[in-house]
C-alpha cells in the first residue's frame, strides 16, 4: 500500500516521489541510476529522522490518527493466535466499535479487548468510527468477567476519539457504563495490561484502560479532550488546535514524565503505519515483559499493587517558598 503522507511530511513525500519516479525509469533505462536512488533514499531517511525528532504535540496527534496506522485487529493478527471473537453485551446489542475475544499470547490463554475504527467508509460507519456506545463498554465488561472467572490475563488496546455522545447512547446510560467499567477494572482479580495504540480520547479510552500496566506507543496520544474540542471551548476556534495540543500535554513522553503511564513502546522510523510488522514485534516484547511481571503474583498482591498505583495519581509535594 502506498504511504499517505501528512501535511508536515511534504518534504519527505516529494523525495519519495522522486525516488519512485527514478525506480520506474530504471526499469526501462540502459543507464545505471541505482547510486542516485540510493543517495536520495538516504537523504529521505535522514530527513525523516530529523523531522520525527522534533515533532510538536499537534503533529503527534496527526500521526496517532493516521488512516494507515495499525488498529486493534491488525495487532491481534500479528501478536495473538487462536483468536475467537465474542459478541454482544447480553442486554441490548453488539457494538462493533469494541472488539474482543479469547486468544493465545506466546502460547498462554488470554482475553483481548480493544477499540476498532474501520478502514473504509462502510466499515467506519459500522464501527461508529471507533466511538463506543454503552453496549460496547458493557460487552467489554462481560469479557473481563469471563477472563476473571478463568484466571486469564487481559490485554486491552485503546484507540478512540472518545465515547459516542449521541442521544441514544446517553439514554442507555453512557456515563454509567463508563463509570461501572472503571469500578470493575479496579477490582478485577486478574492482570490487566493496557496499551494506547492511537488516540486515547477521554473517558471513552479510560473505560478499558484501568490496568496494572499502561503503555503507549511512541506516537499515540492520551487526553481528556481532543485538541480541536479544547480549542473550540477555550478559544472558540478549532484553528487553535496546535496550541491546545501543546497545553493538553497529550504525548507519551509528557505523560510518562508525569507518572501517568508506565512505559513507552518505540515505533519504527516514520511511525507505526510505515512498518506495522516492526511495530508489532516491538509491542510483543513489551507485552511479554509486562505479563511476566505479574505471573506468580497472588490476587491480593495484584489488587493491592493496582490500588496503590491508582491512588498515586494526583499526588503533590509542598515546598517552602523563599522570601
From Swiss-Prot:
The protein's name: Acetyl-coenzyme A carboxylase carboxyl transferase subunit alpha 1
Listed GO biological process terms: fatty acid biosynthetic process; malonyl-CoA biosynthetic process
Subunit relationships: Acetyl-CoA carboxylase is a heterohexamer composed of biotin carboxyl carrier protein (AccB), biotin carboxylase (AccC) and two subunits each of ACCase subunit alpha (AccA) and ACCase subunit beta (AccD).
One cellular-component annotation, GO: acetyl-CoA carboxylase complex
Stretches assigned to coiled coil: none
Gene giving rise to this polypeptide: accA-1
Enzyme Commission number, as recorded: 2.1.3.15
TM region(s), chain numbering: none
UniProt KW keywords: ATP-binding, Cytoplasm, Fatty acid biosynthesis, Fatty acid metabolism, Ligase, Lipid biosynthesis, Lipid metabolism, Nucleotide-binding, Transferase
Protein location: Cytoplasm
InterPro entries assigned: Acetyl_CoA_COase_a_su, ClpP/crotonase-like_dom_sf, COA_CT_C
Record-linked Pfam families: ACCA
Traits of the deletion mutant: Remains resistant to thailandamide.
The protein's annotated pathway: Lipid metabolism; malonyl-CoA biosynthesis; malonyl-CoA from acetyl-CoA: step 1/1
Domain CoA carboxyltransferase C-terminal positions: 39-293
Known catalytic reactions: N(6)-carboxybiotinyl-L-lysyl-[protein] + acetyl-CoA = N(6)-biotinyl-L-lysyl-[protein] + malonyl-CoA
Family of the protein in this entry: Belongs to the AccA family.
Amino acid at each position: 500500500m502506498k504511504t499517505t503522507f501528512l501535511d508536515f511530511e511534504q518534504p519527505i513525500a516529494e523525495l519519495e516521489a522522486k525516488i519512485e519516479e527514478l525506480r520506474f525509469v530504471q526499469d526501462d533505462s540502459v543507464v545505471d541510476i541505482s547510486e542516485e536512488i540510493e543517495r536520495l533514499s538516504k537523504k529521505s531517511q535522514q530527513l525523516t529522522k530529523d523531522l520525527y525528532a522534533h515533532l510538536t504535540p499537534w503533529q503527534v496527534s496527526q500521526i496517532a490518527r493516521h488512516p494507515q496506522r495499525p488498529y486493534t485487529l491488525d495487532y491481534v493478527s500479528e501478536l495473538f493466535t487462536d483468536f475467537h471473537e465474542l459478541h454482544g453485551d447480553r442486554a441490548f446489542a453488539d457494538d462493533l466499535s469494541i472488539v474482543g475475544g479469547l486468544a493465545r499470547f506466546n502460547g498462554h490463554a488470554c482475553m483481548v479487548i480493544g477499540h476498532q475504527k474501520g478502514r473504509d467508509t462502510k466499515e467506519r460507519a459500522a464501527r461508529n468510527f471507533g466511538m463506543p456506545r454503552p453496549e460496547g463498554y458493557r460487552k467489554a465488561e462481560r469479557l473481563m468477567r469471563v477472563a476473571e472467572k478463568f484466571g486469564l490475563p487481559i490485554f486491552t488496546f485503546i484507540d478512540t476519539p472518545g465515547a459516542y455522545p449521541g442521544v441514544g447512547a446517553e439514554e442507555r446510560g453512557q456515563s454509567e457504563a463508563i463509570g461501572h467499567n472503571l469500578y470493575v477494572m479496579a477490582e478485577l482479580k486478574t492482570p490487566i495490561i493496557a496499551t494506547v495504540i492511537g488516540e486515547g480520547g477521554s473517558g471513552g479510552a479510560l473505560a478499558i484502560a484501568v490496568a496494572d500496566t499502561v503503555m503507549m506507543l511512541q506516537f499515540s496520544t492520551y487526553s481528556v479532550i481532543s485538541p480541536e474540542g479544547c480549542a473550540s471551548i477555550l478559544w472558540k476556534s478549532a484553528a487553535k488546535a496546535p496550541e491546545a495540543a501543546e497545553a493538553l500535554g497529550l504525548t507519551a513522553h509528557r505523560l510518562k514524565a508525569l507518572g501517568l503511564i508506565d512505559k513507552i513502546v518505540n515505533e519504527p522510523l516514520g511511525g507505526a503505519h510505515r512498518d506495522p510488522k516492526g511495530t508489532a514485534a516491538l509491542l510483543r516484547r513489551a507485552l511479554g515483559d509486562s505479563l511476566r511481571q505479574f505471573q506468580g503474583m497472588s490476587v491480593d498482591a495484584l489488587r493491592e499493587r493496582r490500588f496503590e498505583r491508582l491512588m498515586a495519581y494526583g499526588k503533590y509535594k509542598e515546598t517552602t517558598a523563599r522570601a
